[in-house]
Structures are given as C-alpha cells and as structure tokens.
Amino acid sequence: MPLPRGFVQPCLPTKALEPPSGEGWLHEIKHDGFRVIARKDGKRVWLYSRPGNDLTYRFPLIVESLAKLRSRSCIIDGEAVACEGNGMPSFDRIRYRRHDASVFLYAFDLIELNGDDLRREALDTRKATLASVLRRAAPGLRFNEHIEADGPTVFAHACKMGLEGIVSKRKTSTYRSGRSPDWLKSKNPACEAVRREEEEDWGR
C-alpha cells in the first residue's frame, strides 16, 4: 500500500541499556502518547501515525493550532499527548476517545519548512528553528523541551517522577527514517506505559 503524499517515515530511537553520559547529547522526556507526523500546507493539515495511517480527524485542537501557524508549510514530528488533571500523561484517554479536543502535540523535530528539507541539518539547528516556528503558537502545540545534562541523572529524575523514560539524541544527528543509533530510548521499567509498549509497540 503506497504511503500518503507528504508523509515522512519517522526516525525511531534504538533501545539503550543505559542512558548515554557525556557531552553532545540532548535528553527529552519520553511522552506516553501517539507518535505523529504533522503536515501543514497553507491552511490544510494532515496528521499521520507512525506507519502512515490518517489521524487527522482524531485531534481537532492540534489540527486547528497547526493551521494557524505563520509558516506557509511545514512537516513536524512529535507526540500527541493527553494529560490528566494532575498533569501526568494518560494513554488510555488518548487511545479510547475517538475525537478528543484536549490532546496536545509535543513537537520535538522539524523535518521541512516552507519547502526546504531540513533533514540534513543538525538536530540542535532543527530544534532551534522549530522553537522559532512555535513561538506564540496556538494552545494545541507545545515545544518539547530538552535538557543538556548527564543522561543517567536525567533518567533517574524522570523515573522518580513516574514518567515513561527519556529519549537521548546526538546534537549533531541528521534526521533519517527508521531506527537510528543517534537516538536512544531509556525506559522506566516500573512504568505501566513501558510494559504496554513492549507488548503493543505503541509510540516511539
């Protein structure tokens, strides 16, 4: 089955035995949600799942917010996340509600902007451009912040907070579809989301 027009197969992290330490890495929280490739062309917006299925109808707030971006066109990689009242991500909420207006896109990479392919740019450059694109964005879009610190320390804090884990990325890495050794995921074994992902292969 052919992939949809404008869909880019996402870059996927490789499972790590332990988080990387040392310089040259960005560490992001691993959210418990749906991986989304978002494409905007003028006022039209499409949302695709990791394998390329159409998710556009499911997340109206994300679609509305993307349509309001000032950029003419873009392709953004991120995670659609629903949060409970305590601020913690809720996968069940996002999975079982067919139309949820309270799901946000945590954007962590910019693949294309106004017709320019950014995949050969370094990650830290792409993220800086993404932050600029999302400045004053509508409520459905959130820039996924990163931390430049010791990986094991960041991971330990994420586990204490009950989060799913972290994704560590080389600052100089380019964006390439499929599994990448430059993106490493470290998962909290005590987290229910991790056990579910092992069984069902959701998320990133």
Regions inferred by a protein language model and the residue ranges of each:
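Catalytic cores of nucleic-acid ligases and guanylyltransferases
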Residues: 1-204
